[in-house]
């Protein structure tokens, strides 16, 4: 209907348990919203949003849509082109920042997958300070072609680990909690 590029509408919609519409917000993520996670912090729940394409950001929000913090490319990681933290152009390069999803750490920090950009996994502390990165572009152990999603495996009876989906390689790669490569599981057609 001629509105394909319209970006002035919400991207997050809230419904109650009876499927009744409650509210909508998040227009700032329209055209690039990708990953969204809910995290319990004390007595409150928060939304963590990863947005790629021209949006190129990640944010923490209240369940009513108030921004707690909003961040762009972690330039201190050394993996991004100069100016990537202010760019709004769609760049599908390994020096671009195109985040896809989060995984949460017990210390209040989190991991962020740059699944369409540098293919790095970034670790942030509870105050949203960049701590470290692992992964990156490649075909070998510990490298990715589309580090799309991630999860912290804390199942009972197992040593905690970080599991990263690599969609282009159809694999799950497993890392210890310091981001050191452990093993690859193949053949998933992810």
Model regions: which residues?
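A generic tandem-repeat structural signature
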Residues: 31-81
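Beta-propeller fold detector
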Residues: 23-26, 68-84, 131-136, 183-187
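Beta-propeller domains
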Residues: 1-26
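A short loop-to-beta-strand structural motif that recurs across blades of beta-propeller domains
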Residues: 9-13, 56-59, 119-123, 171-173
């Amino acid at each position: 209907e001629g509105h394909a590029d319209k970006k002035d509408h919400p991207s997050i919609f809230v419904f109650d348990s009876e499927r009744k519409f409650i509210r909508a917000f998040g227009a700032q993520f329209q055209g690039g919203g990708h990953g969204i996670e809910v995290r319990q912090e004390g007595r409150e729940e928060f939304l963590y949003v990863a947005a790629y394409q021209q949006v190129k950001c990640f944010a923490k929000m209240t369940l009513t849509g108030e921004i707690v913090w909003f961040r762009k490319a972690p330039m201190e990681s050394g993996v991004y082109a100069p100016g990537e933290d202010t760019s709004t152009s769609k760049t599908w390069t390994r020096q671009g920042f195109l985040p896809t999803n989060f995984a949460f750490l017990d210390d209040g920090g989190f991991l962020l997958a740059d699944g369409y950009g540098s293919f790095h996994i970034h670790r942030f502390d509870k105050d949203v300070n960049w701590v470290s990165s692992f992964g990156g572009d490649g075909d070998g152990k510990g490298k990715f072609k589309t580090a799309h999603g991630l999860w912290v495996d804390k199942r009972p009876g197992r040593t905690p680990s970080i599991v990263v989906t690599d969609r282009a390689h159809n694999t799950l790669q497993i890392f210890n909690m310091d981001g050191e490569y452990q093993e690859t599981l193949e053949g998933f057609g992810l």
